[in-house]
Regions:
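Intrinsically disordered, low-complexity regulatory regions with latent secondary structure
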Residues: 1-27, 33-40, 330-331, 339-388
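Cytosolic regulatory protein-protein interaction regions
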Residues: 2-3, 36, 44, 167-310, ...
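Alpha-solenoid helical-repeat scaffolds
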Residues: 5-8, 12, 31, 42-49, ...
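Hydrophobic/aromatic-rich effector regions of fungal transcription factors
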Residues: 18, 38-44, 54-67, 78-119, ...
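Start-of-helix signal in alpha-solenoid helical-repeat scaffolds, especially tetratricopeptide repeats
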Residues: 53, 103, 148-149, 153, ...
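Short, surface-exposed loop/turn segments at secondary-structure junctions
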Residues: 65-71, 92-96, 141-145, 216-228, ...
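Charged/polar, low-hydrophobicity segments characteristic of intrinsically disordered regions
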Residues: 86-97, 139-154, 189-201, 251, ...
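Acidic/serine-rich, low-complexity amphipathic helices located in mid- to C-terminal regulatory regions
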Residues: 105-209, 372, 377-388
């Protein structure tokens, strides 16, 4: 039996594994020897035993998932961290160092669950993460703090990509407007240059929730008027989505090893995914919808351009949305093959849950002619699906 003390024996090996082998799949930026995510995370790891333990849990979970004997180390270290976080009184005042420590710990625990393949704990802790982030940014100068920019972008990224599989979106934190529409031209390691599209995804989620609630109302003139307004909201969001462009100056100071062409392609990939999500959740477009099929085909063309690059770490949500609107066998086989190879290469088991969800969609729509509410299927599956 592995004890908490015995976990420390594995610390040097697992720390080195995280830094050199696992962390490169976490960032869409940089190249060999340069990872912007590590620049902000490692200083906190080195001063905080809690974050260090969380990091060991993450690395051990990933290592165990690739066939190495670290299951007990992963379990003990994760349980130790979860016990402390779940007993935390989030209403008390924290120092800035404590805020950083607890936010990184929450995020890393989410990463542990994504590697395991089920994000229930992350979803359960999301209100805590949102609340801590909002309170922190009331007193922190976001524009001048690379650490809090990294924490904020990381939280928003994983929050949004977890909520995409829910039929009822949350009340999004007001601070996400400030985070995702930040005027500075720097790009980040989680969303690259796609932050504004992520903000639109929060608005699409809200609109989709309103559509779902309205459709449940009894037939009436008021219901018809509400649906008309919601369709108008769809048109307005679609126009804003199509107008998203790369901010001026974004290429001035790129991290070493970053390919600007991949940043441009990633914007087109996420633009296509967001439009498919908008049409699916708001207009309830069936898989036979010609416009959606054309968008999916263009999305797949762009996505192939970033396979094997750091940007593929973002690709599961776009790939899934393309799959929903792909009806021919060859296209569906390609999507499964890409997903499977990505899961094998990265050791991230959340991809398996996404593949299983897509296979269930296709099982219910074998010919590509129906509307299948995959978000409802995801909720009924009992697995918390995360595209992050």
């Amino acid at each position: 039996m592995v004890t908490a003390a015995a976990v420390l024996e594995h610390l040097p090996t697992l720390y080195d594994y995280f830094v050199t082998s696992f962390s490169p799949v976490l960032s869409v930026l940089g190249g060999p020897g340069h990872n912007p995510v590590l620049d902000q995370l490692l200083p906190v790891v080195q001063r905080s035993p809690l974050v260090m333990c969380a990091l060991i849990a993450w690395a051990a979970t990933h290592r165990a998932g690739t066939g190495h004997p670290y299951h007990d180390v992963a379990r003990v270290s994760a349980e130790t961290v979860e016990m402390q976080i779940d007993s935390l009184d989030v209403t008390r005042d924290f120092s800035n160092d404590e805020r950083e420590e607890y936010m990184w710990t929450l995020i890393i625990l989410g990463g542990v669950e994504i590697v395991r393949g089920d994000s229930k704990g992350w979803v359960r802790r999301l209100p805590m993460a949102r609340g801590m982030l909002e309170r922190a940014l009331q007193s922190v100068d976001f524009k001048s703090s690379p650490t809090w920019q990294s924490l904020a972008y990381n939280t928003a990224y994983h929050d949004i990509l977890s909520v995409m599989a829910m039929t009822r979106g949350p009340k999004w934190p007001a601070v996400y407007d400030r985070i995702l529409n930040h005027n500075n031209v720097e790009i980040d390691g989680y969303m690259g240059a796609t932050r504004r599209i992520f903000y639109l995804l929060t608005e699409i989620s809200t609109l989709a929730t309103e559509v779902a609630a309205t459709l449940e109302l009894p037939e009436s003139g008021d219901k018809d008027r509400e649906l008309t307004d919601l369709v108008a909201g769809h048109e307005a969001l679609l126009a804003r989505l199509r107008a998203v462009d790369i901010p001026l100056g974004v290429f001035v100071q790129l991290p070493i090893g970053t390919d600007r062409s991949h940043l441009i392609v990633a914007i087109e990939v996420f633009r296509g995914a967001a439009e498919l999500y908008l049409r699916h959740t708001v207009l309830r477009a069936a898989s036979s919808d010609l416009q959606c099929r054309l968008i999916a085909k263009r999305l797949m063309h762009n996505l192939r351009l970033i396979l094997g690059t750091p940007h593929e770490s973002q690709m599961m949500f776009p790939l899934f949305m393309a799959g929903v609107y792909t009806s021919h066998d060859a296209g569906r086989t390609e999507i499964i093959n890409i997903s499977t190879k990505f899961s094998e290469r990265t050791g991230v088991r959340s991809v398996i849950a996404i593949i299983n969800l897509l296979l269930e969609v296709w099982k219910r729509d074998p010919d590509g002619t129906l509307y299948v509410d995959w978000r409802k299927l995801a909720e009924e599956s009992g697995v918390a699906v995360s595209f992050g």
